[in-house]
Amino acid sequence: MIQKLFLLVRSLVILSIMLYLGNLIAYYIPSGVPGSIWGLLLLFLGLTTRVIHLNWIYLGASLLIRFMAVLFVPVSVGIIKYSDLLIEQINILLVPNIVSTCVTLLVIGFLGHYLYQMQSFTHKRKKVIKRRENQVKQAN
């Protein structure tokens, strides 16, 4: 029981430190990116470079994910409270969302097509090289 409590506290402390560092970065680098996103990027870098081990944060992260719906209640209440303001500004909110979604879909589509073509080209090139090697072996 004590060990599980220690693991929970350790994971929440690590997640809190990442959030704090993210907020610190957001304060000193005024790029418009929220501190929580910077914190997630730092956590991602820590996990991919294995500076932070997954089992160190697993318990706290699973606890937060389990209660994620409760964490969205204040946001939902805010949307309901300011729904008249959102309706007034719908064209300002809707047009950029639609345009950015379309641009994202186009970029991903073209990139996927390009990468598929490159993979096909690489596969064909390997076949040609293998065929040439076989021809050279047969000629000798």
UniProtKB/Swiss-Prot annotation:
InterPro entries attached to this UniProt entry: LrgA/CidA, Uncharacterised_UPF0299
Topology in membrane: Multi-pass membrane protein
Main location group: membrane
Superkingdom classification of source: Bacteria
Pfam name, any one: LrgA
Record keywords, A-Z: Cell inner membrane, Cell membrane, Membrane, Transmembrane, Transmembrane helix
UniProt key word Cytoplasm: no
GO cellular component: plasma membrane
Protein name: UPF0299 membrane protein CGSHiGG_01475
Family affiliation: Belongs to the UPF0299 family.
Disulfide pattern: none
